[in-house]
């Protein structure tokens, strides 16, 4: 299946390159659109899936109208885009407009180094992991700017909560990725996946030797995206919508889009760092060449990556429907007193496992 997709892309790439410098620019723009458009469409269907799944958990139907609920998210998008963006009279006008853009831009830029397969990646950067850490850290600036520019105590309180929470859990996430870097010997995302390849299937994935780091990264990813049960930033019972309380229309839609794009991104990164990315869980167990349409089941391919991502994206919804919101002090305690010490200890354990050959870096 991967070969079939690449056979469609390569001739198109060569045709654009044949147009000269202008063709190279157009090809770059096309690659950006090939990332942005699917992300936007995926967010729309993800919202529908969230409503449906929570509806089933509540023993109700969920969205049933507008194409059996499938197109309800698109209807919501059009509704928000055609609504007026009301700016408070006391707000800082320029900063108020820049804030949602500053939140959305890093959420989309991070996708440029995410590999969907061995050859399906926009930019196979050698420092992809460091680039991701930088991009995912920039989003908090838009949130802080929104809270300050709104000139509202509720928005500012939500922004301050977000800043403290994101900074706290970024440290734990960064330490967890140090363990991944030690185990793989690389900061290139494709090389991290290749380091988990082998003839033992899922036993070669980093999920098993780095299981504590996997849990830390997963939970920290939920906290990083301000989702339940770590959604004190938008605590409805306390500060309404937090930093977004003064936003409406298209500006609110940009914040909404950035949040869900980050949720999907975290699901991708967990799958790449700990579950072998596009690798098959039975890789090495079956050696057969039958058809490109089914060989990916044991050879690996982007469908495996999408299935793993679907699981973690659905887990976000499960967390929201199942767990009560943490208090702010409990969130800080979990990040600083539990996750950071745990990751530091397991970094040392990972180094020892690599030194004594317990972790093998691919085949």
Curated annotation (Swiss-Prot):
It comes from Xanthomonas axonopodis pv. citri (strain 306). GO terms for molecular function: NADH dehydrogenase activity; oxidoreductase activity, acting on NAD(P)H, quinone or similar compound as acceptor; quinone binding. It is found in: Cell inner membrane. Pfam families: NADHdh. Coiled coil: none annotated. Its EC number is 7.1.1.-. It is a multi-pass membrane protein. The chain crosses the membrane at residues 62-82, 96-116, 127-147, 163-183, 202-222, 238-257, 264-286, 299-319, 339-359. It catalyses: a quinone + NADH + 5 H(+)(in) = a quinol + NAD(+) + 4 H(+)(out). One of its GO terms (biological process) is aerobic respiration. Belongs to the complex I subunit 1 family. Keywords: Cell inner membrane, Cell membrane, Membrane, NAD, Quinone, Translocase, Transmembrane, Transmembrane helix, Ubiquinone. NDH-1 is composed of 14 different subunits. Subunits NuoA, H, J, K, L, M, N constitute the membrane sector of the complex. GO terms for cellular component: plasma membrane. NDH-1 shuttles electrons from NADH, via FMN and iron-sulfur (Fe-S) centers, to quinones in the respiratory chain. The immediate electron acceptor for the enzyme in this species is believed to be ubiquinone. Couples the redox reaction to proton translocation (for every two electrons transferred, four hydrogen ions are translocated across the cytoplasmic membrane), and thus conserves the redox energy in a proton gradient. This subunit may bind ubiquinone. This is NADH-quinone oxidoreductase subunit H.
């Amino acid at each position: 299946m991967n070969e079939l997709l690449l056979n469609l892309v390569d001739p198109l790439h060569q045709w654009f390159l044949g147009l000269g410098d202008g063709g190279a620019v157009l090809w770059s723009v096309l690659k950006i659109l090939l990332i942005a458009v699917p992300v936007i469409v995926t967010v729309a269907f993800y919202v529908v899936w969230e409503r449906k799944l929570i509806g089933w958990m509540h023993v109700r139907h969920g969205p049933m109208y507008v194409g059996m609920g499938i197109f309800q998210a698109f209807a919501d998008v059009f509704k928000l885009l055609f609504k007026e963006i009301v700016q408070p009279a006391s707000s800082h006008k320029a900063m108020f407009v820049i804030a949602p853009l500053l939140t959305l831009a890093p959420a989309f830029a991070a996708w440029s180094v995410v590999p969907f397969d061995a050859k399906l990646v926009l930019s196979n950067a050698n420092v992809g992991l460091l680039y991701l850490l930088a991009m995912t850290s920039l989003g908090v600036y838009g949130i802080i700017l929104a809270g300050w520019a709104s000139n509202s105590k509720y928005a500012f309180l939500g922004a301050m909560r977000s800043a403290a929470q994101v900074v706290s859990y970024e440290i734990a996430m960064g330490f967890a990725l140090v363990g991944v870097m030690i185990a793989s010997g690389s900061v290139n995302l494709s090389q991290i996946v290749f380091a988990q390849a082998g003839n033992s299937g899922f036993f070669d994935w980093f999920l098993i030797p780095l299981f504590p780091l996997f849990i830390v990264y997963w939970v920290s990813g939920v906290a990083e995206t301000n989702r339940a049960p770590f959604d004190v930033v938008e605590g409805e019972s306390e500060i309404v919508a937090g930093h977004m309380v003064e936003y409406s229309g298209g500006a609110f839609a940009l914040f909404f889009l950035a949040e869900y794009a980050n949720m999907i991104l975290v699901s991708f990164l967990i799958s790449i760092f700990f579950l072998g990315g596009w690798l098959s869980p039975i890789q090495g167990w079956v050696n057969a060449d039958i058809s490109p349409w089914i060989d990916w089941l044991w050879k690996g391919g982007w469908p495996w990556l999408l299935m793993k991502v679907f699981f973690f994206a659905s887990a976000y919804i499960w967390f929201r429907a199942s767990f009560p919101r943490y208090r702010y002090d409990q969130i800080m305690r979990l990040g600083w007193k539990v996750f950071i010490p745990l990751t530091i200890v397991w970094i040392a354990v990972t180094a020892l496992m690599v030194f004594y050959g317990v972790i093998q870096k691919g085949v």
